[in-house]
């Protein structure tokens, strides 16, 4: 490392205030686990007292799931050039089944490490990777199948419960019954239940042993619905500092995992900066980087190049790999009559390779070799849907479902090696065909977690595909999808900027939460109930703070009612002071209380009084001023 900080290191000394300031109205809290070093972060939203007019009771703070890591904690000094604290390092080391290497195993990684020309963009702190001891398997699935509850499993159990036991107000606990379509929704998540779900293959806990900075989370249909955000540079846009900032921006608004899809310069170095500063799991599509190593010529790819890329990324700490092993030679002709053919970048790369060599996909033929690498680092499979439909006309065709059947076959093979696995799904699917996708995935893949891109429910809205896809995402999340991959307004049009990322995440947080409500996930409705109570009581700041995007809510309110006094007003800009339905309802309740009646009696009596008053004034609709 150079003695003087590089330009990149200077940029990385701090992030912009917009992505590191605390989220309005809340603070970071930590829930203590069974051991001193197991503290689970949550976001506690402070609530104000109910106005005397509405009863005057205290409203206790509400805890919610938090993906933002230490970036929203004012007690933590952030230095991107150092990276985050290795939260899980001791848990990994104490298991005694891994060893620290003397250096990188990947030939590409070693070459980058010794290239002085990269000093200006290299992550400053050198970290030696770990790997499983000879003959060991270090996956969370392996531990789970041996009856071991790891600290990571306890961590996610605490996290999923969101301190629901602290909510004692029965009105906040009220919840409509859900329809879970056969899912095993629990009233309370226990560490043992987490272990059982991972052992069964119905959930994954993606935590590479070389990403100790990550805060454990779980993906499975019996848990909260998660969302993924994509970032990554390209040959024409964005540098390392911008990508790290996009990472932090993504998790601030609720990204549960982030995929680095970089295809431009310095892919290796960009990924190192991202992983060292990420409190959430990081996923990649290794074939993208492998293609860069052969100058973009798909036919020049080899198993040896791909294998070296897997090891390179596993030793950096990538938590899950998208592997397009289901794109088989026999399926490629099935796409010929499609409207949009093969739209997956990874799928098209492997299809081109298969056709160029007229051989079976080497990711398929070497699948068990890949499993050996995955279990040595605890990298999870995200089995890619390389033949997903790129328009609703192509939905649910033979190519898509043929690949899905192969992914089911590969899932069972991965499970034989105790490798955690989830399945990627479409794509573009009209609403009436969505459930068929979910049902077939559950059947073919043994209930392994489904991870879907949308699906987009119509093709006519370029610029608004975060909406067209959030509709499908809410539906498929309700039917059983475990994680939803966000779509931004720039989908099909260009690379997203920071605002596009925020808009995409918000659309998908809404979809995921709507799915949890529909499934009947325990406590899912508490936040809705708390916000509704705040709305009825005109606690404006509490309404903002309980929302998914407090800053946007306040910004919209302030456009028409900017004064501080308006935060105490018993009306909003939509109806004004005289036509607010909630104010009228409260007036009825006050009248009832004053006259010892129930609400219905008060409304009837009040109407009679108003009728008499109207007649006494001459029964004129319009009175002269």
Curated annotation (Swiss-Prot):
Biological-process GO terms, alphabetical: thiamine biosynthetic process; thiamine diphosphate biosynthetic process
Organism listed in the record: Xanthomonas oryzae pv. oryzae (strain KACC10331 / KXO85)
Cofactor note: Binds 1 [4Fe-4S] cluster per subunit. The cluster is coordinated with 3 cysteines and an exchangeable S-adenosyl-L-methionine.
A Gene Ontology molecular function term of the record: zinc ion binding
KW Iron-sulfur (keyword) present: yes
Function: Catalyzes the synthesis of the hydroxymethylpyrimidine phosphate (HMP-P) moiety of thiamine from aminoimidazole ribotide (AIR) in a radical S-adenosyl-L-methionine (SAM)-dependent reaction.
Pathway the protein acts in: Cofactor biosynthesis; thiamine diphosphate biosynthesis
Reaction it catalyzes: 5-amino-1-(5-phospho-beta-D-ribosyl)imidazole + S-adenosyl-L-methionine = 4-amino-2-methyl-5-(phosphooxymethyl)pyrimidine + CO + 5'-deoxyadenosine + formate + L-methionine + 3 H(+)
Binding site for substrate: 230, 259, 288, 324, 344-346, 385-388, 424, 451
Assembly: Homodimer.
Record-stated family: Belongs to the ThiC family.
Obligatory cofactor(s): [4Fe-4S] cluster
The entry's keywords: 4Fe-4S, Iron, Iron-sulfur, Lyase, Metal-binding, S-adenosyl-L-methionine, Thiamine biosynthesis, Zinc
Protein name according to UniProt: Phosphomethylpyrimidine synthase
């Amino acid at each position: 490392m150079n003695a003087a900080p590089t330009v990149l290191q200077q940029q990385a000394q701090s992030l912009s205030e917009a992505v590191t300031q605390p989220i309005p109205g809340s603070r970071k809290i930590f829930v203590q686990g069974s051991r001193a070093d197991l503290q689970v972060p949550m976001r506690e939203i402070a609530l104000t007292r109910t106005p005397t007019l509405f009863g005057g009771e205290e409203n206790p703070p509400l805890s919610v799931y938090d993906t933002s890591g230490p970036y929203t904690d004012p007690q933590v000094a952030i230095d991107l050039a150092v990276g985050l604290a290795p939260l899980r390092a001791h848990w990994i080391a104490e298991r005694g089944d891994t060893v620290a290497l003397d250096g990188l195993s990947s030939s590409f990684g070693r070459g980058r490490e010794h290239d002085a020309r990269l000093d200006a963009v290299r992550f400053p702190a050198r970290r030696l990777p770990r790997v499983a001891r000879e003959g060991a398997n270090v996956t969370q699935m392996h531990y789970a199948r041996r009856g071991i509850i790891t600290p990571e499993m306890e961590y996610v159990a605490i996290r999923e419960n969101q301190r629901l036991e602290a909510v004692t107000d029965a009105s906040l606990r009220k919840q409509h019954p859900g329809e879970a379509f056969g899912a095993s929704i629990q009233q309370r998540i226990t560490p043992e239940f987490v272990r059982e779900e991972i052992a069964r293959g119905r959930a994954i806990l993606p935590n590479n042993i070389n990403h100790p900075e990550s805060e454990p989370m779980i993906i499975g249909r019996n848990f909260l619905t998660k969302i993924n955000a994509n970032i990554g540079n390209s040959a024409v846009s964005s540098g390392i500092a911008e990508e790290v900032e996009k990472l932090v921006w993504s998790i601030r608004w609720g990204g549960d995992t982030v995929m680095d899809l970089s295809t431009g310069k310095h892919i290796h170095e960009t990924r190192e900066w991202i992983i060292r500063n990420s409190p959430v799991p990081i996923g990649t599509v290794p074939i993208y980087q492998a293609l860069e190593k052969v100058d973009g010529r798909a036919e020049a790819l080899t198993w040896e190049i791909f294998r070296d890329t897997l090891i390179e990324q596993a030793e950096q700490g990538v938590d899950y790999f998208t592997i397009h092993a289901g794109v088989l030679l026999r399926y490629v002709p099935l796409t010929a009559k499609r409207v949009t053919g093969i739209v997956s970048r990874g799928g098209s790369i492997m299809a081109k390779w298969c056709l160029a060599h007229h051989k079976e996909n080497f990711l398929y033929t070497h699948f068990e070799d890949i499993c050996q690498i995955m279990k040595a680092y605890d990298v999870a499979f995200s089995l890619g849907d390389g033949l997903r439909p790129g328009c609703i006309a192509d939905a649910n065709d033979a190519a898509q479902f043929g690949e899905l059947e192969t992914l089911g076959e590969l899932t069972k093979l991965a499970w034989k090696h105790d490798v955690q696995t989830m399945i990627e799904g479409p794509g573009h699917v009209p609403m009436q065909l969505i459930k068929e996708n979910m049902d077939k995935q559950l059947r073919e893949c043994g209930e392994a977690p489904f991870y879907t891109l949308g699906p987009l429910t119509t093709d006519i809205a370029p610029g608004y595909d975060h909406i067209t896809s959030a509709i499908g995402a809410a539906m498929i999340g309700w039917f059983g999808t475990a994680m939803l991959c966000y779509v931004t307004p720039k989908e099909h049009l260009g690379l997203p900027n920071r605002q596009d990322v925020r808009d995409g995440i918000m659309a998908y947080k809404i979809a995921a939460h709507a799915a949890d409500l529909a499934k009947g996930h325990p406590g899912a409705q508490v936040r809705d109930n708390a916000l509704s109570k705040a709305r009825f009581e005109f606690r404006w700041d509490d309404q903002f703070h309980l929302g998914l995007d407090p800053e946007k809510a306040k910004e919209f309110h302030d456009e028409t009612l900017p004064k501080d006094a308006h935060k105490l007003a018993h009306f909003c800009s939509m109806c004004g002071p005289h036509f607010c339905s909630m104010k009228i309802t409260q007036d009825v309740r006050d009248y009832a209380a004053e006259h010892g009646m129930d609400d219905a009696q008060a409304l009837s009596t009040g109407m009679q009084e108003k009728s008499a008053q109207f007649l006494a004034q001459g029964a004129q609709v319009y009175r002269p001023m």
